[in-house]
Each structure stands twice: as C-alpha cells, then as structure tokens.
Amino acid sequence: MIKVVKVAHVQLCSCCGCLVSLADTYEKLLDVLNSIELVYCQTLADAREIPECDIALVEGSVCLDDHHSLEVAQEVRKKAKIVVALGACAATGGVTRYCKGNQLSKPVHSSFSPLTEVIKVDLAIPGCPPSPEAIVGVITAALNGDMEYLQPYAELAEKGSEACGCDVIYKVVNKSLCMGCGTCAAACPTRAIEMLDGRPNVLKELCIKCGACSVQCPRIRFPELIEKIE
C-alpha cells in the first residue's frame, strides 16, 4: 500500500499571498492534492492543533513580540519531518524586515524574523510571492526524493536573511560567470534588478531580500551542469 504524504500549511505573519500563488497552479494543483493528504490549513478549515505531518509549508515571518507566533513555529518543528519556509517572509524576512511599528497612540516596534532564524528549516522557497512553478516543483521533488533539485532550496534555508540581489553580483558577475541571460531580472518581484550592457545591476533601495534572483540564476542553481554544457 502506497503511503500518503501528510502535508500541513501553517500561516504566521503574512498576507496569504503564498497560498494564493499555490492556487494559481490551476490543474497542477489537482495533481498535487491527489498525491498528498492536506491535514492542516486554517485558511480552508478551522483546526486547533497542528498534527504530525511529513511536510509543513510555513508561510510568513515570526513576530518576536508575539508568544503565540513563537510557539507555533516551535510546534511546527516538533510535528513535521520536513519544514519548508514558503515565500520571502518565512525564508529571508522579506518586506517584514522593514516594519517600523503600528499606528496606535503609543506606537510599538514589532520585530519580525524569518522562520529560518527561529527554527531549523529544511527547505526555503524564495519569492514574494514564490512562483506557482517553484512551489509545485519543490513539493513534487520532495515527494519523489529528488535531492539534486532541492539542493538550492536547502542552501537558501541555511543562509536565511543573507539572501539578496547582492548574491548575484558577488557570486556571479564579479567572478565573470554571468551569461547575461536576464533570469535574475525576470525573477525579481520588485524590479530591483535591471540589465545594463548585458549584466544585472541591483537597485538596493528596491530590493526586499526575497532571494528569488539568486535561486533562479542558472550559475548558482546548476553550476556543475552549466560547466558541462560549456
């Protein structure tokens, strides 16, 4: 009998855009849902406790001033065999890194950290929101045990908030490895990367440190494969 993979979707401090991105896969979503058992997703059904699961997709950053948020993050790590940071907020901090507090009569500065800095995360899918193809690709690779495909996402999970457009500059452009394909610019959700003379230029004031560009860059994602082709 084939074991059904149990998957949980956990939402922390986020806008739910990552889950919407997953829904945008349309017919592919049906293939994914037919391959798994969705055991937890408060956006779709009310549930009090996170059950034990094989894969936990965690969306959103962790509010360090909210004990509940911290407890949920720790509970996910205990209950899930594989924890996936879904989207920029969970993977690198994203736009929540720029939070300056609310608009109450006594403004309080709320501190947010990516999930990768609070608990041990196995995989991180960047992007704000992550592309539907990336989400389905990671879930499918995890179901099939394709570690080669998952390697860039595992590395991003270890880097945490360090991921940003500077990765492309330091790791690729400055080492004369850039092919000028423009994949990094196409992957950027805020248009913080522009191509000048066939090379990417990062506009730091627009970069939200989502990590999408570095994971999509073929030089970073498939370095050995590119070397073989050349």
Curated annotation (Swiss-Prot):
[4Fe-4S] cluster 2 binds at C188, C207, C210, C213. It comes from the Archaea. Keywords: 4Fe-4S, Electron transport, Iron, Iron-sulfur, Metal-binding, Oxidoreductase, Repeat, Transport. It holds the Pfam family Fer4_10. One of its GO terms (molecular function) is coenzyme F420 hydrogenase activity. Residues 169-197, 198-228 form the 4Fe-4S ferredoxin-type domain. Its EC number is 1.12.98.1. It is an enzyme of class 1 (oxidoreductase). It catalyses: oxidized coenzyme F420-(gamma-L-Glu)(n) + H2 + H(+) = reduced coenzyme F420-(gamma-L-Glu)(n). [4Fe-4S] cluster 1 binds at C178, C181, C184, C217. Belongs to the FrhG family. Heterocomplex of the form (alpha(1)beta(1)gamma(1))(8). Reduces the physiological low-potential two-electron acceptor coenzyme F420, and the artificial one-electron acceptor methylviologen. This is Coenzyme F420 hydrogenase subunit gamma. It comes from Methanocaldococcus jannaschii (strain ATCC 43067 / DSM 2661 / JAL-1 / JCM 10045 / NBRC 100440) (Methanococcus jannaschii). The gene is frhG.
